[in-house]
UniProtKB/Swiss-Prot annotation:
Origin species: Pseudomonas fluorescens (strain ATCC BAA-477 / NRRL B-23932 / Pf-5)
Function: Involved in the biosynthesis of lipid A, a phosphorylated glycolipid that anchors the lipopolysaccharide to the outer membrane of the cell.
Residues in coiled coil: none
Catalytic reaction equation(s): a (3R)-hydroxyacyl-[ACP] + UDP-N-acetyl-alpha-D-glucosamine = a UDP-3-O-[(3R)-3-hydroxyacyl]-N-acetyl-alpha-D-glucosamine + holo-[ACP]
Span of the signal peptide: none
Annotated family: Belongs to the transferase hexapeptide repeat family. LpxA subfamily.
UniProt-listed InterPro entries: Acetyltransf_C (IPR029098), Acetyltransf_C_sf (IPR037157), Hexapep (IPR001451), Hexapep_transf_CS (IPR018357), Lipid_A_LpxA (IPR010137), Trimer_LpxA-like_sf (IPR011004)
Keywords: Acyltransferase, Cytoplasm, Lipid A biosynthesis, Lipid biosynthesis, Lipid metabolism, Repeat, Transferase
Compartments in which it is found: Cytoplasm
Protein name in the entry: Acyl-[acyl-carrier-protein]--UDP-N-acetylglucosamine O-acyltransferase
E.C. no: 2.3.1.129
Subunit comment: Homotrimer.
Length: 258
């Protein structure tokens, strides 16, 4: 029995693995590739060039791979690449890239993108991230592994969201968020570190204590960023987790959320 509903529309150039499921009224456009075990629900629109990996699930009314609304976009060929084991819930929108940046929007593996979230053009989402309902990423946003963006979080273009970071509900992020940091508010302010997330992921208590001290160095001692980075040199050499925190600050191009 075919796993493609007869009411779905599949472009002849689309490439689907044999066990891909496509629900009624969904449209799989030209240049779309879908890997094995992926399930496309009803009323989904997929536009290419888009490559979707293995064992993903995309729910109804999502629009994946559509043209970017960026006014610089003039119809150039750009792409969207989605990895494996992602869940994309109802009404999600994900746009392809632009030639002015990297020509590609990327979603990694094992991510949960919840209802009505938006991923803008040229954004790069890592692995094991959660974008909760109505979270919206502008163009060129980078989200590192294990980050969690709570409902209605808004992220300004070109911001970098560090690994294992966490945003509270309704947060408006306009600057980079360092790794492990918890932010909340409009505009976003750093409140603490995502210690609960670290414990759930098996971080040692020594590493957590080292990160707690590193956070206080950056946020509680009245130091400039350069002064704080100098203070972090020794603990970063001892704890790789502190090095990740330090490096996420050092590489910031928009300034960090304070």
């Amino acid at each position: 029995m075919s796993l493609i509903d007869p009411r779905a529309i599949i472009d002849p150039t689309a490439v689907l693995a044999d066990d891909v499921e496509v629900g009624p009224w969904s449209i799989v456009g030209a240049g779309v590739e879908i890997g094995e075990g992926t399930v496309i629900g009803p009323h989904v629109i997929l536009k290419g060039p888009t490559r979707i990996g293995k064992h993903n699930r995309i729910y109804q009314f999502s629009s994946v791979g559509e043209d970017t609304p960026d006014l610089k976009y003039k119809g150039e060929e750009t792409r969207l690449v989605i990895g494996d084991h992602n869940v994309i819930r109802e009404g999600v929108t994900i746009h392809r890239g632009t030639v002015q940046d990297r020509s590609e929007t990327t979603l990694g593996d094992h991510n949960l993108v919840m209802a009505y979230a938006h991923i803008g053009h040229d954004s790069v989402i890592g692995n094991h991230c959660i974008l909760v309902n109505n979270t919206a990423l502008a163009g060129h946003v980078h989200v590192d592994d294990w980050a969690i963006l709570s409902g209605f979080t808004l992220v300004h273009q070109y911001c970098h969201i560090g690994a294992h970071s966490f945003s509270g509900m309704g947060t408006a992020i306009g600057k980079d968020v360092p790794a492990f940091v918890t932010v909340f508010g409009n505009p976003a302010e750093a409140r603490s570190m995502n210690f609960e997330g670290m414990r759930r992921r098996g971080f040692s208590e020594d590493a957590i204590h080292a990160l707690r001290r590193a956070y206080k160095t950056v946020y509680r001692q009245g130091l400039t960023v350069d002064q704080a980075l100098a203070e972090l040199a020794e603990p970063a050499a001892q704890f790789p987790e502190v090095a990740v925190f330090r490096d996420s600050i050092q590489s910031s191009t928009r300034g960090i959320t304070r």
